[in-house]
Amino acid sequence: GGYIRTDAIYDFNQLGNINQFRPESIPTPNLDVSNYNMAARASRLTLESRTDTKWDVLRTYIEIDFVGPGNTTELRLRHFYAQLRNILVGQSWTTFHDSDVIPETADFNGPNSWIFQFNPQVRYTHRLAKGQTVSISAEQPSSGIPRINPVTAQPVSSTSPLPDFVVRYRYETDDYHFNTAGLFRSVGGVRSSGQSDHVFGYGVMASGLLRLWGRDNIVFQAVYGEGISRYFIDPKNLNLDAGYDSSGLLKAQPAYGGYAAIQHFWNE
């Protein structure tokens, strides 16, 4: 399966990123140059299988798009996982993410504060009661820190001694759903001298969807934490999980964001 999507963008004052609205890429001072761009990078290909086993149905899912690095059209793996009953193994949305509250914006990037991360992981989901589930996962970590300690001038290599751990609770009815999650991680690196610097990072997230009349709905998401910038779509590649203070010590950086959106259907 999949679909073809083509974006045509005319920018009156050219952004640093010609394909998406990424505030972190806006040049300073602004460029007084217009630009037109057309791309089909957001098109997707999917493949799903369901196989009967003696335990239950084994589901596998693969999804790719063409949003490669540096505005290229290289293949990008979004999902590649196997799921049997309550256990998921492979790459998918981080458990810290709520895929039901993504606003349908004209720009593929979406709100710059929403949680956007595909992680290799092992996830277990337990049904508590009707409409209530709890999920726990151990996920691939990655420490976004400066590559140079500005005080000692030593090169630093990022390291992550532990998986990122996520716990999520979800409550859902026919009229609304509410989702909250906690993220716990270790962020750090090793200096060229061999000294290791690691700090604790955490995040909390709340999101939800409320159905109005017909198919209209309101969605929201709010996030706060320290050492979690890689989970936000806009600053995820800026190495802002942690930074060095004036004493050369590594400190987790606070990060927070949120949005709300309403979706209205003009016809059936």
Where are these regions (language model features)?
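Flexible, solvent-exposed coil segments and beta strand-coil junctions
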Residues: 24-28, 99-106, 146-150, 181-188, ...
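Detector for outer-membrane/organellar transmembrane beta-barrel domains
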Residues: 172-268
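Outer membrane beta-barrel
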Residues: 1-20, 28-145, 161-162, 166-177, ...
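Long hydrophobic alpha-helices with heptad-repeat/coiled-coil character
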Residues: 119-170, 236-268
